[in-house]
From Swiss-Prot:
Subcellular location: Nucleus
Main location: nucleus
Stretches assigned to coiled coil: 284-353, 737-761, 900-934
Keyword annotations from UniProtKB, A to Z: Coiled coil, Developmental protein, Differentiation, Metal-binding, Nucleus, RNA-mediated gene silencing, Spermatogenesis, Zinc, Zinc-finger
A Gene Ontology BP annotation from the UniProt entry: regulatory ncRNA-mediated gene silencing
Binding site for Zn(2+): 486, 489, 512, 523
GO cellular component: male germ cell nucleus; nucleus
Protein name according to UniProt: MORC family CW-type zinc finger protein 1
Protein's UniProt keywords contain Nucleus: yes
Length: 984
């Protein structure tokens, strides 16, 4: 159906968008203010807002806005129907409107249709914007008829008479004006050579069928129907427009009576001005810098294209290409200059003027009035002490600030600010200056009652208005200057204080010649408003107690943060011990209780006792697949501590640390500590030669960029007497505390190992003729955490002095450990890749003798094996996981699209149901009125409760009315039949 009017202009907007766009105005007067802003931006000196009764239309009247602004030409009028097309943002003048959306959103919030008449120069244009027309004609896109005439001849401007006739026929059918004479009459209402008349009709209704705007209660005002607000500016359009502009100069008439617009800064008692210098509000400046940077990039790309064309063009087109290049260079320079200016503005501090004063006319109407570009955005915003109930500090104080558009940008409906964080910061600052104002003026909690009594307020703080007596009126007039605006020059003049205060009323017509002050009784005189005292914000440094309190809070916060990051001891349970190895030595016995180990050459005799236990604690580390180096570390360290096993089982006594070799880290273990994470035990008293010739052979294969696996151990060494045994205790930083139950579980295990090693002790005693042990056994191991799917790396630290032959140096537990290690590796690979062939290093059934003689070679083989695992198997596994993730993401995106489509369909169904329900409520209200049963005034819940109560009670009147209707209908039928027969 959209192709029925191909010649007419279209607003390039969908019909459903018009309704959605109008809902941005939650505050109804905010929609009306959009239309006032358009008149002010057009330079209008006078604006009339009035209603015209018309019972044929929805709502019963039309709402009209008439201004004497610059008007619009046919070309300019065609721009207003498009969304976001406005030249105001590009202008150097500071217009209120910036988005090109106020006319559509504001008028469509009030009613369904509007018709606009405008005059400029020699033309008259009519713009017909109607939702009713589009709905009746089943048009999904908004079609806008726009006929134009010449002012002198009243003839059509267009050359297409068929289009002109079609536009007029649509206007006659769907507008309140049915003939061309009525249309011309509306142009005649515009009394000047230029101006605009906006007529809004088919007004929006409430649930009770009444219009949202009430023009019947007060014939000189437009009220908001059903409003229960305390502040008049929220329910009276006259009160709202009186404070709508920070610097009012346009005269506003509502229902043919002038609005007493207020220069709010000069209507307060004891006003004071504060200069707030800040660099906090940078949101709008950052957006401007981004736009300038994008413009520079676009200009530079155009310049590059022009340079390429100059290099490739022929001689004939060379001159034109150079001209294009020159223009591109100039454009780049201009854009770069603009970018530098925007960046300079971003760094520049801004100064905001904050005004404060007391509203002595009604102290309950206090709060902050926040303007943006001279337009009111928020009003009666409570800040600081005003937020507290029954607080006297700041009672009756009004704060005013006018924020430039480039500092903080308002929203599209001009009722909020886009940057909520900056707005909240502004309110906080205004609360601080409110306290400073109360200090400067002496209006504090102590003398506030005396101050209020001077203006006629009683002691009760709930009293809003002062007493209406001559004494208090004179006091108010002496404290607050009376300013009035001239109707000719629109300048504000201050009347002298000798004026009769009882007869001081607002005049509908006042000019400068009526001013008793001879210095300002002419329109040629310069406007001179009262000066406002300048206040300063005291910057008193915080007291010593406040500084100490802040420092204490920061220290506590830092300590809590350190406590969260502090590593805690971790206990390795007995069931995780994987390797136990022993090595024996022979030495002489000596029962001296005060024996000390000397490392530099003393002849010592030690008790023959040897046993050590190696414990590998596994720790799951997350493998980083993207790295390319080896992911395995082998760490071998020796940590020794002497302690008596018998004393360990019986009691815990004070221990004395013993000096150890350089590779052993010494620490002191407290008696209160109950850590029992014993990973290696060595019970031996080596001879002097053994200590001199002992060398620790360790190897490790490190990854170049490994970030995860570093295991640090703490060694605690103590010596009590000659019969004590040497114990190596390793505690990890991430371990937890150990209970006594776990300690008891380890003791039987140690005893069992002691019994198993008796034969080895005898064998080592027979081979004690060897000078020293030449090798240090270090066994690399790995354990697997299959539940998480990651390889865990384990470091085993062990140390012993071997004095036997190569055949007996390698014990059976070490071979068993290596076998378990290989089996675990096979389980890992088969878990990830059951279809691949395992490396040959892992397929060998047992270790060869090379491990005994050259452990480095076996370590190289293991490194090659792990490199193959990482470079081959893990890469394949990574690709497989990536494919799975991609498929999952694709499925989730597809489901999301389907969900959005279904959500949109459900939303449309919901809107249709709401419209049906709304129509049903309207019809129900009409039905109840016809049946004389009254009707509920309120929302849907009140309607439901009213109907339920009506159905439950036996309403005789309802039954009687039904009986009367049926009886009357029966009597009418025979009478009509008799009349028809008599006529025949």
């Amino acid at each position: 159906m959209d192709d029925r009017y191909p010649a007419l202009q279209r607003a390039q907007l969908r019909l459903d968008f018009i309704h959605a766009n109008s809902t941005t105005h939650s505050f109804l007067f905010g929609a009306l203010a959009e239309l006032l802003d358009n008149a002010r931006d057009a330079g209008a000196e006078r604006l009339d807002v009035f209603s015209v009764d018309n019972e044929k239309l929805q709502g019963g009247f039309m709402l009209c806005f008439l201004d004497d602004g610059c008007g619009m030409s046919p070309e300019e009028a065609s721009d207003i129907i498009y969304f976001g097309r406005s030249k105001k943002r590009l202008s150097t003048l500071k217009f209120i409107g910036q988005y090109g959306n106020g006319l559509k959103s504001g008028s469509m919030r009030i009613g369904k249709d509007f018709i606009l008449f405008t005059k400029k120069e020699e033309t008259m244009t009519c713009v017909f914007f109607s939702q009713t027309f589009c709905e009746e004609e089943s048009l999904s896109e908004v079609v806008v008829p726009m006929p134009s005439w010449l002012i002198r001849t009243r003839e059509s401007v267009t050359d297409d008479p068929q289009k002109f006739a079609m536009e007029l026929s649509i206007i006659y059918k769907y507008s309140p004006f049915k003939t061309e004479a009525e249309l011309m009459q509306q142009f005649d209402v515009i009394y000047g050579k230029c101006g605009t008349l906006l007529v809004i009709y088919n007004l929006k209704l409430l649930l009770n069928g009444e219009p949202e705007l009430d023009v019947k209660t007060d014939k000189e005002d437009i009220l908001m129907a059903g409003a229960l607000e305390d502040f008049p500016a929220r329910w009276s359009f006259r009160a709202y427009t009186s404070v709508l502009y920070f610097n009012p100069w346009m005269r506003i008439f509502i229902q043919a009576k002038r609005v007493k617009t207020k220069h709010l800064c000069y209507c307060l008692y004891r006003p004071r001005k504060y200069l707030y210098v800040t660099s906090s509000f940078k949101g709008a400046f950052k957006d401007e810098v981004k736009k300038a940077e994008e413009a520079v990039k676009i200009a530079e790309s155009i310049l590059k294209e022009a340079q390429i064309k100059v290099n490739q063009c022929d001689r004939t087109s060379l001159s034109s290409a150079k001209d294009v290049l020159q223009r591109a260079l100039e454009d780049v320079e201009a854009k770069q200059k603009n970018l530098k200016e925007k960046q300079r503005e971003l760094k520049t501090a801004r100064t905001l003027s904050l005004f404060y004063g007391v509203n002595v006319e009604n102290r309950s109407q206090a709060g902050m009035f926040i303007y943006s570009n001279n337009r009111l955005i928020k009003m009666h915003e409570k800040v600081g002490s005003q937020l507290k109930l029954k607080s006297l500090l700041g009672a009756g104080v009004v704060g005013i600030v006018n924020i430039p558009l480039e500092v903080m940008e308002p929203s599209h409906n001009k009722q909020e600010f886009l940057n909520v964080q900056e707005y909240n910061h502004l309110l906080k600052v205004m609360g601080q200056y409110l306290v400073q104002y109360c200090k400067d003026t002496g209006i504090n909690n102590r003398n506030l009652t005396l101050f209020c009594n001077e203006f006629g307020y009683q002691n009760d703080i709930d009293v809003e208005k002062p007493l209406n007596s001559f004494q208090y009126q004179r006091r108010q007039a002496m404290g607050i200057p009376f300013i009035i605006q001239c109707d000719l020059c629109l300048k504000w003049r201050v009347l002298p204080s000798s004026t009769n205060y009882q007869e001081k009323e607002f005049f509908d017509i006042w000019i400068c010649a009526n001013n008793p002050n001879r210095l300002e009784n002419s329109c040629h005189q310069v406007e001179c408003l009262p000066s406002i005292p300048l206040g300063t914000m005291s910057t008193i440094s915080p007291s010593k107690n406040e500084k100490e309190k802040q420092l204490r809070e920061s220290v506590i916060k830092y300590q809590n943060r350190l406590a969260e990051q502090q590593p805690q001891p971790q206990f390795i349970p007995v069931d995780e011990i994987t390797v136990t190895s022993t090595c024996l030595t022979s030495a002489h016995k000596e029962n001296t209780k005060t024996q000390k180990i000397r490392l530099l050459g003393d002849d010592l005799k030690h008790e023959s006792l040897s046993s050590f236990e190696l414990s590998a604690s596994r720790r799951g580390q997350k493998r980083n697949i993207e790295e390319t180096d080896s992911d395995v570390e082998y760490i071998s360290e020796t940590k020794i501590m002497k302690k008596s096993m018998e004393e360990k089982m019986n009691s815990q006594q004070q221990r004395i640390p013993v000096a150890l070799p350089e590779n052993v880290k010494l620490a002191e273990r407290s008696q209160r500590s109950q850590i029992a994470n014993i990973t290696t035990v060595w019970r031996a008293q080596p001879t002097e030669g053994c200590l001199k010739n002992a060398q620790a052979a360790s190897w490790e294969m490190k990854r170049k960029q490994s970030l995860n696996f570093v295991e640090e151990c703490k060694v605690l060494t103590e010596d009590e007497n000659t019969s004590d045994s040497d114990i190596i205790l390793v505690s990890d930083k991430s371990n937890t505390d150990v209970s006594l139950k776990q300690e008891k579980k380890e003791i039987p295990l140690l005893n069992q190992e002691k019994q198993e090693l008796c034969n080895d002790v005898l064998a080592m005693k027979r081979s004690s003729s060897l000078p020293s042990w030449k090798s240090l056994l270090n066994v690399p191991m790995e354990d697997v955490n299959l539940s998480s799917g990651h390889i865990a790396r384990v470091s085993v630290s062990g140390s012993c002095k071997v004095a036997s032959s190569p055949a007996s140096s390698q014990s059976t537990p070490v071979k068993e450990t290596v076998r378990k290690l290989k089996s675990k590796l096979r389980e890992i690979l088969l878990y990830f890749f059951p279809e691949h062939q395992l490396p040959s290093e892992l397929e060998e059934p047992a270790l060869s003798c090379e491990l005994e003689q050259c452990p480095e070679q076996m370590n190289k083989k293991l490194k090659m094996c792990f490199n193959q695992i990482q470079n081959t198997y893990m890469v394949q596994y990574e690709k497989k996981i990536k494919r799975k993730l991609q498929s999952i993401i694709y499925d989730s995106n597809t489901r999301g699209i389907h969900n959005e489509i279904s959500l949109g369909q459900c939303e449309n169904k919901r809107k249709i149901s709401e419209d049906k329900l709304k129509n049903l409520r309207i019809k129900l209200a009409l039905l109840l009125q016809k049946l004389q049963l009254g009707g509920p005034e309120g929302d849907l819940e009140q309607t439901d409760t009213y109907l339920e109560a009506l159905l439950k009670e036996d309403n005789l009147l309802f039954q009687n009315n039904l009986n009367k209707v049926t009886i009357d209908a029966r009597h009418r039928l025979p009478l009509e039949k008799n009349e028809k027969t008599s006529e025949n």
